């Protein structure tokens, strides 16, 4: 593993990913450590255009189109991220595990299709650490209620998010490598040192 790792933050809506990645970014900045922070979907200019299309409240893509849009965003991002790979710490808000959790466990897309395209896009780009944020159903609902703007992914029924969160937890059990489940307290303690 490099001293300039790729660190991914995963989890369902309202689980604290954005808070955690922002805390780590502030910590790295305080320590004068070079880093780049991106989100998926989104990140580079073309990926942000795709993000708007995916998250538009009125968008109603079928599950395969939805998958391909997410992977198109990833492909665009990786063109940019490869310039910094092993040169800067790379922080990513959602990545390949989100694709599997949402598209496969949430929407039922064939896992073989997801893995095939993901592997084709990723090639030699490897994640060093994945931090999985989990949240209870009640806390997720409360957190989504206070959001100022909601996208179409914030408006699914709670049982959808529970399926997705179970998907993340299944991935963590299967992979057993580099996925760490975090609480807000742990990450804030780490970054406040």
What does each model-identified segment do?
Residues 14:
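Walker A (P-loop) phosphate-binding loop of P-loop NTPases
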Residues 99-166:
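A glycine- and Lys/Arg-enriched "phosphate-lid" helix/loop adjacent to the NTP-binding pocket
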Residues 20:
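Hydrophobic positions on the alpha1 helix immediately C-terminal to the Walker A/P-loop
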Residues 17:
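Conserved lysine of the Walker
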Residues 33-122:
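ATP-dependent small-molecule kinase phosphotransfer cores
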Residues 9:
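Hydrophobic anchor at the beta1->P-loop junction of P-loop NTPases
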Residues 2, 25, 138-193:
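NTP-dependent small-molecule kinase module
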Residues 1-6, 33:
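Extreme N-terminal, non-catalytic leader segments
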């Amino acid at each position: 593993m490099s001293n300039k790792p790729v660190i991914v933050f995963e989890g369902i809506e309202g689980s604290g990913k954005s808070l955690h990645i922002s805390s780590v970014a502030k910590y790295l900045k305080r320590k004068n450590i070079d880093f780049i922070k991106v989100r998926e979907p989104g990140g580079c200019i073309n990926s942000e255009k795709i993000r708007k299309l995916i998250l538009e409240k009125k968008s109603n893509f079928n599950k395969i189109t939805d998958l391909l849009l997410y992977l198109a965003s990833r492909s665009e991002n990786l063109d940019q991220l490869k310039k910094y790979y092993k040169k800067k710490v790379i922080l990513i808000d959602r990545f390949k595990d989100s694709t599997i959790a949402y598209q496969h466990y949430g929407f039922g897309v064939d896992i073989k299709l997801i893995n095939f395209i993901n592997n084709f896009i990723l090639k030699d780009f490897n994640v060093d650490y994945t931090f999985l944020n989990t949240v209870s159903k009640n806390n997720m609902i409360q957190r989504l209620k206070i959001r100022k703007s909601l996208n179409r992914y914030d408006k699914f029924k709670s049982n959808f998010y529970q399926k997705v969160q179970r998907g993340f937890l299944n991935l963590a059990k299967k992979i057993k490598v580099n996925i760490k489940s975090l609480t807000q307290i742990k990450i804030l303690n780490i970054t406040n040192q």
